[in-house]
């Protein structure tokens, strides 16, 4: 059975990030890599990967400067694009929405909510237009799974328990809201390491320190193809660590840690 392996990483504008990206693509056998804040040299990365007989191409993301998508799969076509979102059609079977939403420093929950509502609307338009139900979201949402944009019915509606998503939608105030299944809830907290993808030590009254800002969400129909054990937050490669001496994301590399997941294809 074929598999689709995807990685998402906010590379924090690090111009020297390519050696880390190369390690991840090789070791994790990545088919599609979605990057936020990528400002390194793609041609340099291609040469690094060529040493392993790996050929990558850049997907078309015109209209979305915040996302760079690198692919090893040939059959990927662009769909809707805007400032915060690049949608891609994979094998005429999956709709992949790659997002980088604004930071809490520059947009409050209401502003982010406007951007999210527009994207959710467009996802449903594309699903209907293309006849695709197998939608995957990969995102640096700058919110945790339990916050409004992720969990709210008018947001991504990312539910932590698959059984509750089997009915596909909820009716609230006489309006139907489709659901996503969000497996990232399982990676919150210190039962496993790392406890999140982003660390922030501030003096706000409410501060969880570790955050899961980088997430994957899937439509419930994909649950059977989602490989639980392959959902990972990476904190190292075989050659290099991505965390510092305090076990926090090494900001000299990136202030975010990458996530990896796998879909078993039909």
Where are these regions (language model features)?
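Surface-exposed cleft-lining segments at the edges of enzyme active sites
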Residues: 101-116
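Structured beta-strand-rich core segments of catalytic domains in phosphoester-bond hydrolases
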Residues: 32-104
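Glycine-rich, phosphate-binding/catalytic loops in enzymes
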Residues: 24-25, 49-52, 113-115, 153-157
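Metal-dependent phosphoester-hydrolase catalytic domains
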Residues: 128-131, 145-266
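Acidic, histidine-bearing metal-coordination/catalytic regions of metal-dependent phosphoesterases
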Residues: 1-3
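Active-site beta-strand/loop signature of hydrolases that rely on acidic residues for catalysis
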Residues: 5-11, 21-43, 96, 119-151, ...
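Short, flexible loop segments at the rims of nucleotide/cofactor-binding pockets, characterized by
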Residues: 9-14, 113-114
């Amino acid at each position: 059975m074929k598999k689709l392996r995807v990685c998402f990483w906010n590379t924090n504008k690090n111009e020297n990030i390519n050696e880390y990206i190369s390690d991840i693509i090789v070791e994790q056998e990545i088919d599609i890599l979605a990057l936020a804040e990528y400002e390194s040299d793609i041609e340099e990365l291609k040469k690094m990967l060529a040493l392993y007989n790996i050929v990558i191409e850049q997907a078309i993301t015109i209209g979305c400067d915040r996302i760079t998508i690198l692919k090893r799969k040939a059959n990927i076509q662009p769909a809707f694009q805007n400032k915060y979102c690049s949608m891609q059609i994979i094998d005429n079977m999956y709709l992949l929405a790659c997002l980088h939403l604004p930071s809490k420093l520059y947009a409050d929950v209401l502003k982010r909510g406007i951007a999210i509502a527009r994207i959710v609307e467009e996802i449903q338009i594309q699903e209907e237009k293309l006849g695709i139900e197998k939608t995957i979201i990969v995102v640096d949402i700058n919110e945790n799974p339990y916050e409004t944009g992720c969990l709210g019915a008018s947001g991504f509606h990312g539910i932590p328990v698959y059984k509750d998503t089997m009915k596909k939608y909820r009716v609230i105030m006489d309006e139907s809201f489709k659901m996503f299944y969000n497996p990232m809830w399982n990676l919150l907290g210190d039962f496993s390491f790392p406890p999140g993808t982003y660390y922030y030590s501030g003096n706000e009254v409410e501060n969880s320190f570790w955050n899961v800002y980088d997430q994957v969400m899937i439509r419930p129909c994909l649950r059977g193809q989602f490989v639980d054990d392959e959902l990972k937050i990476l904190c190292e490669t075989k050659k290099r660590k991505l965390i510092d001496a305090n076990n926090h994301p090494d900001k000299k590399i990136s202030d975010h840690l990458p996530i990896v997941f796998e879909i078993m294809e039909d």
